[in-house]
Amino acid sequence: TFGNSKPFRIKIRNVLNDNFTYFYVKKADASRIYGLEFEHLLSPNRINFLVYKDTLIEEHIAGIPGDIFIKEHLPLCTDRARNEIAKQFVKFNERCTLRLLGDMRSYNYVVIPTHDFDHVDYKIRAIDFDQQNYEGNLKVYQPHFFKENRPMVKLVTDFLEDSSVNQYKKEDMSQVA
């Protein structure tokens, strides 16, 4: 089990075409439900979930776990890709702060590569939606303060000017407005 939700993954298969999708069944609690609601309302990413009594069913978010991405994929990225990842990390950091989404260590988010004609675009999404809105320390809600995310923070300092960081923060906030 992981944490206090005791999750398990189920695979639902369409018998007509053999397509399938994964869902997670977890013990429901208020902080997790609030986190999912905020994700759905305040993020450009929508997530499907269902709550029944003390059970939560949450759709699987596909991607490469952040800790694995940092170890295995990041060293192989081009400078253009690193620049894109830095931009996405700034936006992800902003979204976590806005949604009071705490504990975004690298194993609590995924990096989603999308292949285009001549390059790969990247997005970063949370996969653990526990809220810590009772915490008075703002650092809890900012992924760049966690040591596991230092390689991502280094990308930001190496590839982005302060003016670009501010621009990306404003871009992300404008999606909520």
Indicate residue ranges for each PLM-predicted region.
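Short, low-complexity, polar/charged sequence segments that are solvent-exposed and flexible
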Residues: D29-A30, L42-R46, P75-D79, P143-E148
